[in-house]
Regions:
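Structural beta-sheet core signal
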Residues: 28, 101, 187-189
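Primarily recognizes the serine-hydrolase "nucleophile elbow" in alpha/beta-hydrolase
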Residues: 91-92, 97-146
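Glycine-rich, often proline-containing surface loops adjacent to acidic residues and nearby aromatics
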Residues: 57-67, 105, 183-186
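A catalytic-pocket lid/entrance helix-loop region that shapes and gates access to the active site
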Residues: 139-161
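Serine-hydrolase catalytic core
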Residues: 157-245
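Short beta-to-alpha linker loops that shape the active-site pocket of alpha/beta-hydrolase fold enzymes
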Residues: 32, 62, 67-71, 131
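Alpha/beta-hydrolase active-site loop
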Residues: 72-94
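Short, surface-exposed "cap/lid" segments of acyl-processing enzymes
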Residues: 6-59
Length: 245
């Protein structure tokens, strides 16, 4: 069996099986284009994602992910479902219970909340063009009325509350992600478009703090045409953190 689609709550999920399993699992959390339905997913339909998936499977990794209510923007509901998905995988598959995690864009918001769960062990964390703070994202989008309006509507739907209540809850939230000494992090920044360059300057500023705190965070900048190399870069990073079972 190459893959299995199954439902948790109202959401479709997928697990992809390698031919020769190495015993390690990769949980992926996608960005705004990500989707999963009963028979397909963004990871199988998008050429770039499919090649990443194939590289990981070829190396023996079992890969799994959820539709996560679509544009979740790091909502608690999405975090809870991710934890449920991981419990399901632990119960039903023969895998090391400490997973690698790859999150892209808004998926990073869920990943950062998972880092705070003491009972959830992340073996290593890869963030691709991550959104590291909701308040910073809102601030950035204010420059473009159309995108800001769209983002506000998505946030209200994801968090099931009005924007003012959400802004109040974000008030005082640190724009610095809560990385720790136990979880190695690799940030991959693909430099395409104006927004990506803005994000990269935010990451550069934050990296000074991470270095000061001696946190295990590395950053790679990648040009879009070099994206195919990202899959093997990620595998090399994973392997470094598989010595301790």
């Amino acid at each position: 069996m190459e893959s299995r689609n199954f439902k948790l709550d109202t959401e479709w999920n997928v697990i992809h099986y390698p031919e020769r399993p190495n015993g390690f699992g990769i949980l992926t959390i996608g960005d705004e284009r990500h989707f999963v339905n009963s028979s397909s997913s963004f990871w199988t339909q998008n050429e770039g994602k499919r090649s990443l998936l194939n590289i990981w499977k070829k190396e023996g990794y079992t890969v799994f992910y959820s539709n996560l209510y679509g544009r979740h923007w790091g909502s608690e509901k999405a975090v809870e479902l991710t934890l449920r998905l991981c419990s399901h995988i632990v119960r039903n598959e023969i895998l090391n219970t400490s997973f690698h995690l790859v999150a892209e864009g808004m998926g990073a918001l869920v990943a950062l909340k998972l880092l705070k769960h003491s009972d959830f062990k992340i073996r290593s964390l890869v963030l691709i063009n991550p959104v590291l703070s909701l308040s910073t994202q809102l601030e950035q989008e204010k420059e473009n009325k159309f995108f800001y309006k769209k983002l506000v509507a998505e946030l209200e739907a994801a968090y099931e509350t009005d924007i003012n209540t959400l802004l109040e809850s974000l008030d005082g939230e640190s724009s610095r992600p809560a990385f720790n000494n136990d979880t190695p992090v690799k940030i991959i920044h693909v430099l395409s478009g104006n927004r990506a360059y803005k994000q990269s300057s935010i990451i550069k500023e934050l990296s000074v703090e991470w270095e000061k705190d001696d946190l295990p965070v590395t950053i790679s900048y990648v040009l879009p045409e070099k994206m195919l190399q990202v899959g093997s870069q990620i595998v090399q990073f994973f392997r470094k953190h598989e010595q301790v079972l």
